[in-house]
Amino acid sequence: MSSQKGNVTRSRPQKHQNTFTFKNDKFDKSVQTKKINAKLHDGVCQRCKEVLEWRVKYSKYKPLSKPKKCVKCLQKTVKDSYHIMCRPCACKLEVCAKCGKEEEIVIPFNKEPEPSENTESEGSNHRRSCKRKEDSDEDLDAESDSEGEDEDTQA
């Protein structure tokens, strides 16, 4: 594009056009990339949501390694990247957690606490223990049936 004064419009199309779209997980199939791709951007306005989705789409999104300080409560409670406010403060003030403006929130925060990895593992342990109980109940039923047959043959 020329730097000539007043020449602000481009008169020709783009010289090199990409034939394939960029795939952020084509060569990087790590767990971190999968988590980033699956992340739900809630509590932000439409513009901030589009910005965050663009960052994810083109591998520019970097998750936080440790919590940041909230600009409202001044506690280290901001766990989402590129956000300036923690979830409780953003919910209470009904503002975007990323830009801080009173825009319409596209996807509001969930009221219930997020399920942690510990509760998930407890649930799977619960399923295992239930299955063990069922197996042991079946064993007990089989043993009681065989005892009943023994009594019939002895009498």
UniProtKB/Swiss-Prot annotation:
Q: Establish whether keyword Ribonucleoprotein is in the entry.
A: no
N-terminal signal peptide: none
Pfam families per record: DUF2039
Q: Which UniProt keywords apply?
A: Acetylation, Phosphoprotein
Q: Does the keyword Transferase apply?
A: no
Ranges of biased composition (kind: Acidic residues):
136-155
Q: Which residues carry this modification: N-acetylserine?
A: 2
Please list where the region (Disordered) is annotated. 1-22, 108-155
InterPro entries membership? DUF2039
Q: Which residues carry this modification: Phosphoserine?
A: 136, 144, 146
Q: Where are the transmembrane segments?
A: none
Q: What is this protein called?
A: Uncharacterized protein C9orf85 homolog
Biological source species: Rattus norvegicus (Rat)
